From Swiss-Prot:
The active site is at C35. Its EC number is 1.-.-.-. Pfam families: GSHPx (PF00255). It is an enzyme of class 1 (oxidoreductase). The lineage of its organism: Bacteria, Bacillati, Bacillota, Bacilli, Bacillales. One of its GO terms (molecular function) is peroxidase activity. PROSITE patterns: GLUTATHIONE_PEROXID_1, GLUTATHIONE_PEROXID_2, GLUTATHIONE_PEROXID_3. This is Glutathione peroxidase homolog BsaA.
Length: 157
């Protein structure tokens, strides 16, 4: 099994098969607009712009499961990301990342790379690095600066 077997809705409502990202290195991130870590969008965008021509993509998945820090609707989220951080990487519709109603992709991601003490995602901006074959290679804590992941990304490109 790999992440290529899943699909999710882009922020514009279009269903997107993750198999469309075959042969790309991915960084999948659960995001939020009103979090102390929200400025990580800037570094995520830098990574995307730096490596997109080499087969790298960031996939952002907004979630409102952590202290309601992503309260906006899809249009508000998209506008926020574009206006404040110039985000041009794919942003998906808001999802749940924990619990029985968690999106199947996040159920899979957490089963492949558990966190410290638990598989559960503890906060916004947890990051999962995916290789070109769709395998979950590494999980990063919310506090990990996206730029610090650069070397790991380069190894997979």
């Amino acid at each position: 099994m790999s992440i290529h077997e899943f699909s999710a809705r882009l922020i514009n409502g279009e269903e997107k098969a993750l198999s469309d990202y075959k042969d790309q290195v991915l960084l999948i991130v659960n995001t939020a607009s009103k979090c102390g870590l929200t400025p990580q969008y800037e570094e995520l965008q830098i990574l995307y712009e730096t490596y997109k021509d080499q087969g790298f993509t960031v996939l952002g998945f907004p979630s409102n499961q952590f202290m309601n820090q992503e309260p906006g609707d899809h249009n508000e989220i998209a506008a926020f990301c574009e206006r404040n951080y110039g985000v041009s990487f794919p942003i998906f519709e808001k999802v749940k990342v924990n619990g029985k109603e968690a999106h199947p992709l996040f159920q899979y991601l957490t089963s492949q790379q558990g966190g410290l003490f638990t598989e559960k995602i503890k906060w916004n901006f947890t990051k999962f690095l995916i290789d070109r074959s769709g395998n979950v290679v590494k999980r990063y804590a919310p506090s990990t600066s996206p730029i610090k992941i650069k070397d790991d990304i380069e190894e997979l490109l």
